[in-house]
Swiss-Prot record:
Entries under InterPro entries matching the protein: GHMP_kinase_C_dom, GHMP_kinase_C_sf, GHMP_kinase_N_dom, IspE, Ribosomal_Su5_D2-typ_SF, Ribsml_uS5_D2-typ_fold_subgr
Record keywords: ATP-binding, Isoprene biosynthesis, Kinase, Nucleotide-binding, Transferase
Protein name: 4-diphosphocytidyl-2-C-methyl-D-erythritol kinase
Keyword Magnesium among record annotations: no
Binding site for ATP: 107-117
Protein family per UniProt: Belongs to the GHMP kinase family. IspE subfamily.
Catalytic residues identified in the record: 10, 148
Reactions it catalyzes: 4-CDP-2-C-methyl-D-erythritol + ATP = 4-CDP-2-C-methyl-D-erythritol 2-phosphate + ADP + H(+)
Enzyme Commission (EC) number: 2.7.1.148
NCBIfam families to which the protein is assigned, alphabetical: ispE (TIGR00154), PRK03188.1 (NF002870)
Primary role: Catalyzes the phosphorylation of the position 2 hydroxy group of 4-diphosphocytidyl-2C-methyl-D-erythritol.
Length: 315
């Protein structure tokens, strides 16, 4: 059997960061939206090899950028093991071994949840293979895997609280166009949060202006309320990113912000053509490692706005 699943990347339109909690995480208030950059996972069962215990994953391969782990610490691999573990709690029947392949369409280490999208797509694939587990179980496992995985599982436009894993739908009337500038050098998320704490930065926990802008639906309204509490910390660690922001504004972007904990710079544009023009201008200037035009939220039927099954083939 071969099962293919897909999940989208994300952008944080608002990221409010509260103080660190006892568990080491920060309290977040964030507004997620899917972007039309996707990860595609293919799970292939090896019917002639049955596994009674331990990981069912025999191999993980990747098409796309270098630097993606192909070992058991990969989030997609962990997602498969986690859901198989849930099944073994009530059914110890041996399962076929599997091979995983990831076709990456989201830049690596860019703050757009590529790894979390891999995990979400893997959860959907395993659910189609040996499920159904139910949405509650899938979301529970997703939250155990990472703070962004539940959103990547559901997609759309969501208000996230807690670590970002507690999700509520938000109404969004607009379609937004971006040029996403990927940096050639990564930025450690723990380092950014540590710098945030060190700088004693204020927290933006009120999403009322963002909610109103999303109801308005215009790019101009959204440009006025984009907020990321981690931006000063990220820019302190990587001052060169300010040059990217300025280059984007010169090229015609309406607004600019650090995406998540960085280092990707998100440039909000008037429309799809403007996003392409800004991306072309920045690529001509040699700004960043790559520049990706993107749209948010992902259009289409509700069932495809989050992680979803693309195809199931029986060999």
């Amino acid at each position: 059997m071969r099962i293919t699943a897909r999940a989208w990347g994300k952008i944080n339109l608002h990221l409010g960061v509260g103080p660190a909690r006892e568990d080491g995480y920060h309290e977040l208030v964030t507004v997620f939206q899917t972007i039309d950059l996707a990860e595609t996972i293919t799970l292939t069962t090896l019917e002639d090899e049955l596994v009674e215990e331990g990981s069912v994953v025999r191999q993980l391969t990747v098409t796309g950028p270098r630097g993606v782990p192909t070992t058991p610490d990969n989030l997609a691999w962990r997602a498969v093991d986690a859901l198989v573990g849930r099944r073994r709690e009530h059914d110890r029947t041996p399962l076929p071994a599997v091979e995983l392949h990831i076709d990456k369409g989201i830049p690596v280490a860019g703050g757009m949840a590529g790894g979390s999208a891999d995990a979400a797509a893997a959860l959907r694939a395993v659910d189609a293979w040996i499920g159904p587990f139910g949405e509650e179980t899938l979301l529970e496992v997703a939250a155990e895997l990472g703070s962004d995985v539940p959103f990547c599982l559901l997609g759309g436009t969501k208000l996230g609280t807690g670590r970002g894993e507690q999700l509520v739908d938000m109404l969004s009337r607009g379609t937004y166009h971006w040029a996403l500038v990927v940096s050639p050098k990564g930025l450690s998320t723990p380092e950014v949060f540590a710098k945030f704490d060190e700088m004693s930065l204020p927290s933006s926990m009120d999403v009322t202006p963002m909610s109103q802008a999303l109801l308005d639906g215009s790019a101009g309204a959204l440009a006025e309320v984009l907020e990321n509490d981690l931006a000063p910390a990220a820019l302190s660690l990587r001052p060169d990113l300010r040059k990217t922001q300025l280059a984007g504004l010169r090229a015609g972007a309406l607004a600019t912000m650090v995406s998540g904990s960085g280092p990707t710079i998100a440039l909000l544009c008037d429309d799809a053509q403007s996003a392409r023009d800004v991306a072309d201008a920045l690529m001509d200037e040699g700004v960043g490692l790559s520049v990706h035009p993107a749209t948010s939220p992902v259009p289409g039927p509700a069932k495809n706005r989050g992680a979803h099954i693309v195809s199931i083939e029986s060999e």
